Amino acid sequence: MMCRSLTLRFFLFIVLLQTCVRGGDVNDNLLSSCLNSHGVHNFTTLSTDTNSDYFKLLHASMQNPLFAKPTVSKPSFIVMPGSKEELSSTVHCCTRESWTIRLRSGGHSYEGLSYTADTPFVIVDMMNLNRISIDVLSETAWVESGATLGELYYAIAQSTDTLGFTAGWCPTVGSGGHISGGGFGMMSRKYGLAADNVVDAILIDSNGAILDREKMGDDVFWAIRGGGGGVWGAIYAWKIKLLPVPEKLTVFRVTKNVGIEDASSLLHKWQYVADELDEDFTVSVLGGVNGNDAWLMFLGLHLGRKDAAKTIIDEKFPELGLVDKEFQEMSWGESMAFLSGLDTISELNNRFLKFDERAFKTKVDFTKVSVPLNVFRHALEMLSEQPGGFIALNGFGGKMSEISTDFTPFPHRKGTKLMFEYIIAWNQDEESKIGEFSEWLAKFYDYLEPFVSKEPRVGYVNHIDLDIGGIDWRNKSSTTNAVEIARNWGERYFSSNYERLVKAKTLIDPNNVFNHPQSIPPMMKFEEIYMLKEL
């Protein structure tokens, strides 16, 4: 979900949780014994006390309260490895004792897939694996996958004024899941996705083996950089390429409160600006409707000075009507805090910030052609019917159009103009209306269908949507034809890259230890595995 303002401080606990084993369950005891014998002691088990450390830890990185309800499945164990070796041992023990594994980096899975499952499961929470090592000389960094984007940005800003990284602008998103799905952000038009700038990685496979880029092989290294999180193994760390930024750049964050007609015109003009600006300039927009008026928040980042930024906007988007004081010069690190709605760089380092504590559901689209003015108008009229609905729009173009569709699994490159996200959010006291909210979102999504990508209508795995379908891995009749069933969402997220992802999955995790309802399946039959040699 797009992070928004209204930050609430969260508790900062987490050092070492005492092991507390629930008796009477042989499976639980076997896993506890295995973890302890391998030196993994930092775990807690399911508790009936809602004030226990177990529930504090479960909810600490649960970013969608929709999945906090008592009726939603809970993990039997939450394990917090503190080293590469402990992560390896945790995966080994869970696999040996046949537990379903859920890997949680920041907890931003839109469908709660990092902390829910239909079978007895273990959350492997990566938050203690959040160390970051910056090498300014080589312009690279090693980032443990439990580090949030905010922690990464803070570490870079403390080390250099002339290097940055391209990733999302919500600081509490975990780097493990974000990069695994691609990772779009405010500098993607200049440098591509986060995953495009990964040069090495450490992966723990289902047997607990520790693999670097060379050991995992080209297909698997390609797959983990955009093929989705929680599928290939446990990412211990990424080695990323740091990217040049000026000592001072320019940003703006401006909200326009206007009538629906004027808002429609602004959005209609924005779409032509967003993907055609120089790659050094990105303008994104959030929007919704309150009463009779729409609100549009325009977020801009220019890798240059204020005068140049204002000249470009005055020429390309004069309708926005920005004045001199609305352009602000600051360092790259300060800009990451500013665009997140934070006051200081140091706040980037707080992984427990809560930007919006409402439950939510989202959908995403990509466009390849311009959207007519009347479509924006009607979309805003639909938003006026639902106070909890809003949109987030991003332009592509620039570097995104220059990178080949198969460079990483993320295929939405040349020809893709815009990414639209539709969100509906609601408060706890509105849970009785969930059906109404879901129906509205489906109606909104259906309305946009003629104006977005087609055959198939594509999506983005970091905005995972179970409405598209899913596999119940408990049902053997589903798994026998899993590759074809999964094609329904696999080709929406990855287009023609789906086949290579299946190949990579079969190579690294043939027993499908790492799975969720929309994970990439391995080939199940011997003749299918033999076909890998032909791919």
From Swiss-Prot:
<dbReference type="GO" id="GO:0009820">
    <property type="term" value="P:alkaloid metabolic process"/>
</dbReference>
<comment type="function">
    <text>Oxygen-dependent FAD-dependent oxidoreductase essential to the formation of benzophenanthridine alkaloids in the response of plants to pathogenic attack. Catalyzes the stereospecific conversion of the N-methyl moiety of (S)-reticuline into the berberine bridge carbon of (S)-scoulerine. Involved in the biosynthesis of sanguinarine.</text>
</comment>
<keyword id="KW-0968">Cytoplasmic vesicle</keyword>
<feature type="glycosylation site" description="N-linked (GlcNAc...) asparagine">
    <location>
        <position position="475"/>
    </location>
</feature>
<dbReference type="Pfam" id="PF01565">
    <property type="entry name" value="FAD_binding_4"/>
</dbReference>
<protein>
    <recommendedName>
        <fullName>Reticuline oxidase</fullName>
        <ecNumber>1.21.3.3</ecNumber>
    </recommendedName>
</protein>
<dbReference type="InterPro" id="IPR016166">
    <property type="entry name" value="FAD-bd_PCMH"/>
</dbReference>
<dbReference type="InterPro" id="IPR006093">
    <property type="entry name" value="Oxy_OxRdtase_FAD_BS"/>
</dbReference>
<dbReference type="GO" id="GO:0071949">
    <property type="term" value="F:FAD binding"/>
</dbReference>
<dbReference type="InterPro" id="IPR016169">
    <property type="entry name" value="FAD-bd_PCMH_sub2"/>
</dbReference>
<dbReference type="InterPro" id="IPR016167">
    <property type="entry name" value="FAD-bd_PCMH_sub1"/>
</dbReference>
<dbReference type="InterPro" id="IPR036318">
    <property type="entry name" value="FAD-bd_PCMH-like_sf"/>
</dbReference>
<feature type="cross-link" description="6-(S-cysteinyl)-8alpha-(pros-histidyl)-FAD (His-Cys)">
    <location>
        <begin position="108"/>
        <end position="170"/>
    </location>
</feature>
<keyword id="KW-0274">FAD</keyword>
<keyword id="KW-0017">Alkaloid metabolism</keyword>
<feature type="domain" description="FAD-binding PCMH-type">
    <location>
        <begin position="71"/>
        <end position="245"/>
    </location>
</feature>
<dbReference type="InterPro" id="IPR006094">
    <property type="entry name" value="Oxid_FAD_bind_N"/>
</dbReference>
<keyword id="KW-0560">Oxidoreductase</keyword>
<comment type="pathway">
    <text>Alkaloid biosynthesis; (S)-scoulerine biosynthesis; (S)-scoulerine from (S)-reticuline: step 1/1.</text>
</comment>
<feature type="glycosylation site" description="N-linked (GlcNAc...) asparagine">
    <location>
        <position position="42"/>
    </location>
</feature>
<feature type="signal peptide">
    <location>
        <begin position="1"/>
        <end position="23"/>
    </location>
</feature>
<dbReference type="GO" id="GO:0031410">
    <property type="term" value="C:cytoplasmic vesicle"/>
</dbReference>
<keyword id="KW-0285">Flavoprotein</keyword>
<keyword id="KW-0732">Signal</keyword>
<dbReference type="GO" id="GO:0050468">
    <property type="term" value="F:reticuline oxidase activity"/>
</dbReference>
<comment type="similarity">
    <text>Belongs to the oxygen-dependent FAD-linked oxidoreductase family.</text>
</comment>
<dbReference type="Pfam" id="PF08031">
    <property type="entry name" value="BBE"/>
</dbReference>
<keyword id="KW-0325">Glycoprotein</keyword>
<dbReference type="InterPro" id="IPR012951">
    <property type="entry name" value="BBE"/>
</dbReference>
